[in-house]
Amino acid sequence: MDINVVNALAYEDFVKLFGNVVEKCPLISAAIWSYRPFKDLADIEARISEFIHSLPDSGKEGILRCHPDLAGRDLQSGTLTPESQEEQSQAGMTTLDSAEIVHMYRLNSEYKERFGFPFVICARLNNKADIVRQLSERLKNRRTAELECAIEEVKKICSLRLHSIVLSDIQTKL
């Protein structure tokens, strides 16, 4: 998809197309639409990043709370967004055995209790062993460091989702 096509999208179509590049946060796409025309995909990413970084910590935490637990209840019940379903599947989270599911549940619960938001990692850039290792390691972080780390992971997820949309056929998304 050409950037000119993106720039020509009506507000409603833009939000529909890009509304889940940050999990369950269409407000971000709605806000950056005002910055059109975008120079390129990197410009869209920069605007999203600027928007996220302009938020107070409570806003950043809100973004993180929109993310599902990895291998959690939403995956088990089939209620993930299509993007999250695909990402967790690619990372091997859909093939965990019952002991691994229990272990992930325990780690996810410990993480949420410690930080107040779910563990976020770019699943498409990791496999299940990496995810478990990172989750265990990041439990040792200070809260402020972990908030920044998790937001950086959100930006990686966003970047990959943006690229997937732009490289796909726009007509199938609208």
UniProtKB/Swiss-Prot annotation:
Record carries keyword Lyase: yes
Enzyme class at the top of the EC tree: lyase
Reaction catalysed by this enzyme: 5-hydroxy-2-oxo-4-ureido-2,5-dihydro-1H-imidazole-5-carboxylate + H(+) = (S)-allantoin + CO2
Span of the annotated motif Microbody targeting signal: 172-174
Pathway: Purine metabolism; urate degradation; (S)-allantoin from urate: step 3/3
InterPro entries: OHCU_decarboxylase, OHCU_decarboxylase-1, OHCU_decarboxylase_sf
Gene3D superfamilies: Oxo-4-hydroxy-4-carboxy-5-ureidoimidazoline decarboxylase
GO CC, one annotated term: peroxisome
MF terms in GO: 2-oxo-4-hydroxy-4-carboxy-5-ureidoimidazoline decarboxylase activity
Protein EC: 4.1.1.97
GO biological process, one term: purine nucleobase metabolic process
Location in the cell: Peroxisome
Self-association and partners: Homodimer.
Family classification: Belongs to the OHCU decarboxylase family.
Stated name of the protein: 2-oxo-4-hydroxy-4-carboxy-5-ureidoimidazoline decarboxylase
Organism per entry: Danio rerio (Zebrafish)
Taxonomic placement: Eukaryota, Metazoa, Chordata, Craniata, Vertebrata
Gene: urad
